[in-house]
């Protein structure tokens, strides 16, 4: 069937710079560039270009330019080019449109409408270069009170808290969705910075057991790789109920990405689609969730906190309250801008709510019910920089997870082709010819640098507030002001308008 789809991008080659080295051909995993022997020229298939910029980055003579196709549709506010092209695709395939990464629509980004306070005159600021600043964060359940014996020993069992040196962790991204070299980069960077990385729902590769003190292992609806050794190889065990990019449906790893090594780790046949059920089939109520939480606590000998991850949806505050009362030590909330390796486009773009509103609502609800101390709040889904981290903690988060930002640090250009298994940067692929493009040592260094830079910036902002510890910022919304927000939005966020 002839396609009606135009090329998304046009690749221009500056001929007097091109030395015909064929680097562009070897670097492009989408067969955009090819060599024509008859004409002795390197030519381009524009329809294959996904805009990943791999060829541009590695061209030794800067001979390539990738630009948007200037093809213009007749202007129509209702029928945008994206709407038209989506219909073309479904008319040609008859299937669900899949995409990767997070929602890219122009929905409100509340981080950009929140501004941070600073000390002036009456409350002196602190110079982080000359005075100690504390970013250490503890995750887990804190008791209402502790009983001590005559020797000063605690009389009751308390779930151990997990200490992280920076309030930033790496989001759940499964082996298969991303390559083993990316997993190793994340794990090593987490160890370097004294924080945590998350295996995602695809199990833990045997070569990464050395990082178990910095590992969060996940139990999702597919239960891939879940067995006793796996559960006891993590510092935190996370039950995944949902994720921000696709609330209400299960994970989907195309068979093209299920290599021999991935199949061994996930405990599924090679080359088969790994389709997780939408629900966890042993969880249909808060009571069922509580049973699984305590089953995992028993399996791990009450040695580690149990986290429950949910998507930011309507009534999220009531759901989070139930999760805390069910016994969870950590609640992780993933917002609608959270990314994924593969999701139906219609769900990614239309389901869920912004993480800023969900976080503020959940923190307020738990405080009102007097149970905020019983669980830590971790949020994810759209954290782009240290300013977002700072504002999230002021809104009530104990820590944040980053996924897309971490992948960008490794070279991701957000071409949204994660689901194809052809990632030219070697990130979201199981193709051994592509995965070797990620050097784990260099990747770990880049991620370590990212977190170290953010840590320094957070300390600068804390110092500007006159605060020397991240705990003094947590949930302190008086340090935030809103700009361009409605009265209802300000009320939900719990912040005042700028100027008040």
Curated annotation (Swiss-Prot):
Keywords: 4Fe-4S, Amino-acid biosynthesis, Flavoprotein, FMN, Glutamate biosynthesis, Iron, Iron-sulfur, Metal-binding, NADP, Oxidoreductase, Repeat
Reaction(s) catalysed by this chain's protein: 2 L-glutamate + NADP(+) = L-glutamine + 2-oxoglutarate + NADPH + H(+)
Start and end residues of each 4Fe-4S ferredoxin-type domain: 7-38, 40-69
Binding sites annotated in the UniProt record for [4Fe-4S] cluster 1: 18, 21, 24, 59
GO molecular function: 4 iron, 4 sulfur cluster binding; glutamate synthase (NADPH) activity; metal ion binding
Pfam family, one: Glu_synthase
Keyword presence, NADP: yes
InterPro entries, sorted: 4Fe4S_Fe-S-bd, 4Fe4S_Fe_S_CS, Aldolase_TIM, GltB, GltB_archl_type, Glu_synthdom
Domain of life per record: Bacteria
Enzyme Commission number(s): 1.4.1.13
UniProt: [4Fe-4S] cluster 2 binding residues: 28, 49, 52, 55
Cofactor: FMN
Gene3D superfamilies, A to Z: 3.30.70.20, Aldolase class I
SUPFAM superfamilies: 4Fe-4S ferredoxins, FMN-linked oxidoreductases
Single GO BP term: glutamate biosynthetic process
Family statement: Belongs to the glutamate synthase family.
Protein name, per record: Archaeal-type glutamate synthase [NADPH]
Originating species: Dehalococcoides mccartyi (strain ATCC BAA-2266 / KCTC 15142 / 195)
Lineage: Bacteria, Bacillati, Chloroflexota, Dehalococcoidia, Dehalococcoidales
């Amino acid at each position: 069937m002839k396609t009606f789809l135009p090329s998304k991008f046009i690749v221009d080659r500056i001929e007097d710079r091109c030395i015909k080295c064929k680097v562009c051909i070897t670097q492009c995993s989408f067969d955009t560039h090819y060599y024509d022997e008859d004409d002795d020229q390197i030519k381009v298939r524009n329809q294959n270009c996904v805009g990943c910029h791999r060829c541009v980055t590695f061209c030794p003579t800067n001979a390539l330019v990738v630009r948007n196709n200037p093809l213009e549709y007749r202007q129509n506010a209702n029928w945008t080019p994206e709407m038209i092209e989506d219909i073309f695709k479904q008319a040609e395939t008859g299937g669900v449109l899949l995409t990767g990464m997070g929602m890219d629509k122009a929905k409100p980004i509340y981080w950009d409408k929140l501004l941070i306070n600073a000390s002036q005159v009456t409350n002196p600021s602190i110079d982080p270069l000359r005075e100690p600043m504390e970013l250490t964060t503890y995750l887990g359940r804190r008791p209402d009170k502790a009983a001590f014996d005559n020797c000063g020993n605690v009389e009751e069992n308390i779930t151990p808290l997990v200490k992280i040196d920076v309030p930033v962790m790496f989001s759940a991204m499964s082996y298969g969705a991303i390559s083993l070299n990316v997993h190793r980069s994340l794990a090593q960077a987490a160890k370097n910075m004294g924080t945590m990385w998350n295996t995602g729902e695809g199990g833990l590769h045997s070569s990464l057991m050395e990082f178990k003190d910095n590992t969060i292992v996940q139990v999702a609806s597919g239960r891939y790789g879940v067995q006793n050794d796996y559960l006891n190889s993590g510092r935190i065990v996370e039950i995944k109920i949902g994720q921000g990019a696709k609330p209400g449906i299960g994970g989907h790893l195309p068979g093209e990405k299920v290599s021999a090594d991935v199949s061994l780790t996930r405990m599924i046949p090679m080359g088969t689609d790994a389709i997780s059920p939408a629900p966890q089939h042993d969880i249909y109520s808060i009571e069922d969730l509580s049973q699984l939480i305590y089953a995992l606590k028993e399996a791990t000998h009450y040695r580690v906190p149990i986290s429950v991850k949910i998507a930011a949806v309507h009534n999220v505050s009531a759901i989070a309250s139930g999760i805390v009362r069910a016994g969870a030590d950590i609640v992780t909330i993933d917002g609608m801008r959270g990314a994924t390796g593969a999701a139906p486009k219609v769900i990614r773009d239309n389901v869920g709510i912004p993480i800023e509103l969900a976080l503020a609502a959940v923190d307020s609800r738990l405080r009102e019910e007097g149970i905020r101390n019983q669980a830590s709040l971790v949020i994810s889904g759209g954290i782009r920089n240290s300013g977002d981290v700072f504002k999230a903690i002021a809104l009530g988060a104990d820590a944040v997870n980053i996924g897309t930002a971490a992948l960008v640090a490794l070279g991701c250009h957000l071409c949204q082709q994660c689901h194809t298994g052809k990632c030219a940067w070697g990130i979201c692929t199981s193709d051994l010819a592509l995965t070797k493009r990620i050097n784990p040592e260099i990747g770990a260094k880049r991620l370590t640098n990212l977190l170290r830079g953010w840590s320094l910036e957070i300390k600068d902002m804390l110092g500007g507030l006159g605060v020397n510890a991240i705990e003094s910022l947590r949930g302190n919304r008086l340090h935030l002001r809103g700009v361009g927000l409605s009265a209802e939005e300000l009320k939900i966020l719990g912040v005042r308008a700028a100027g008040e």
